[in-house]
């Protein structure tokens, strides 16, 4: 059917590429491009002979708009799937505009020198993408991504009006390390060490990092402590879900993780301010990333499950209603299928699905759009087909 250019070759990209190759009737050809071409070549070698998808590789600096434009023109893809760093979203969007190519990502733009992510920079491209007749699909991972699809599905099929959304992200996995992150350490630590926030009554209310704690009993995992964080889908859901009064995002963390994180903060290792070290300027957090385990290597040693979903409260036919949509994913099952742990899997599968729905024309809406702005039904069907089956409850335990 078509061709995708996939930028990035980390843990999430590896999953998305595996899933594209399992779906070769749609992804007839892919090009994997990264700053380090050797990683792309190694993945190509691993996959060739197992798929009908034709795989090409390329080297590209995702910070270089001209290089990106040249690569897109050379490969002529139907869609660019951006699985690089959030700092590189805008350069890749610029290249897609210049070449009139559809764009998909999994995380919103964040300036490298400021630990603050929001959609305003990408939403500013709306008119230009619309005029070019191309679509930018923002946030096609799990959270953001599936959480937005869940919200759109709940509104379409279960509610007349949604008033409250609690997004719960639980990782009950154990990788055996004293401290490691399940996705890019730099992005993960910036996210969890920032102030939290939730959206209520038309505005964001800011909290201190890890200030608000709740306990929840997750199916397949058990009771876990979870903490309120700021997360990007709060911003788009507040805009796109009518009737909403409050949205919160909670993520689980173990005591060991939090203790190590506090220690690293106390000695300055989570700082993004440049320092001089032996005559060279380095950023402590980037140095820390270099010495921590690569999330892409955690698959064989991670056991347990993830449970991620949304609890909705609202009204149907004038009556109060509660509803819970969620997915449970097993780390070792993911590893057996694609060589990955479940955190990368739960992001990589939706990334492939979003690209697929643009490529096959199921979703066709020129402009810059968050995922909850599209019909959720094809995406929900694809989740069941491609390894992330969803479950539902009409009588969930609520978060206070």
Where do the protein language model's features map onto the residues?
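C-terminal catalytic/substrate-binding lobe primarily of soluble NAD(P)-dependent oxidoreductases
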Residues: 156-400
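N-terminal Rossmann-fold NAD(P) dinucleotide-binding loop
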Residues: 13-14
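Conserved Rossmann-fold cofactor-binding substructure of NAD(P)-dependent oxidoreductases
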Residues: 61-77, 88
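Glycine-rich Rossmann-fold phosphate-binding loop(s) that bind the pyrophosphate
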Residues: 9-10
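Rossmann-fold cofactor-recognition segment
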Residues: 50-64
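N-terminal Rossmann-like NAD(P) cofactor-binding module of classical short-chain dehydrogenase/reductase
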Residues: 72, 78-82, 103-104
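Rossmann-fold NAD(P)-binding glycine/threonine-rich loop
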Residues: 107-134
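Helix N-cap at the beta1-alpha1 junction of Rossmann-like dinucleotide-binding domains, i.e.
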Residues: 36-39
């Amino acid at each position: 059917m078509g061709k995708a250019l996939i930028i990035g070759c980390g843990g999430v990209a590896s999953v998305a590429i595996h899933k594209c190759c399992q779906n070769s009737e749609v992804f007839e050809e892919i090009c994997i491009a990264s700053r380090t071409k050797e990683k792309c070549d190694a993945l190509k070698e691993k996959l060739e002979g197992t798929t009908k998808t034709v795989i090409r590789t390329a080297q590209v600096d995702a910070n270089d708009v001209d290089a990106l434009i040249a690569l897109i023109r050379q490969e002529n893809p139907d869609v660019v799937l951006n699985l690089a760093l959030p700092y590189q979203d805008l350069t890749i969007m610029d290249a897609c505009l210049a070449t009139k190519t559809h764009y998909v990502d999994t995380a919103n733009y964040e300036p490298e020198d400021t630990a603050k992510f929001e959609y305003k920079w990408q939403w500013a491209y709306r008119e230009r993408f619309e005029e070019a007749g191309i679509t930018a699909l923002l946030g096609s991972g799990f959270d953001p991504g599936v959480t937005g699809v869940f919200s759109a599905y709940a509104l379409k099929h279960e509610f007349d009006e949604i008033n409250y959304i609690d997004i719960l992200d639980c990782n009950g996995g154990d990788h055996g390390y004293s401290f490691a992150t399940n996705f890019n350490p730099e992005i993960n630590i910036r996210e969890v060490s920032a102030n939290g926030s939730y959206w209520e009554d038309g505005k964001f209310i800011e909290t201190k990092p890890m200030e608000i704690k709740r306990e929840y009993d997750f199916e397949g995992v058990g009771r876990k402590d979870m903490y309120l964080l700021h997360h990007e889908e709060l911003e788009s859901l507040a805009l796109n879900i009518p009737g909403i009064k409050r949205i919160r995002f909670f993520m689980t963390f173990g005591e060991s993780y939090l203790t190590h994180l506090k220690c690293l903060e106390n000695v300055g290792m989570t700082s993004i301010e440049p320092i001089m070290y032996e005559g060279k300027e380095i950023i402590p957090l980037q140095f820390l990333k270099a010495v921590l385990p690569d999330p892409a290597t955690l698959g064989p040693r991670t056991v347990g499950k993830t449970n991620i979903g949304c609890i909705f409260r609202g009204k149907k036919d004038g009556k109060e209603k509660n509803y819970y949509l969620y997915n449970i994913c097993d780390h070792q099952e993911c590893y057996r299928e694609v060589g990955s742990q479940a955190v990368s899997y739960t992001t990589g599968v939706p990334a492939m699905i979003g690209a697929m729905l643009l490529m096959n024309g199921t979703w066709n809406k020129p402009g810059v759009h968050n995922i909850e702005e599209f019909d959720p039904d094809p995406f929900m069907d694809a989740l069941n087909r491609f390894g992330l089956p969803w479950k539902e409850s009409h009588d969930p335990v609520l978060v206070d």
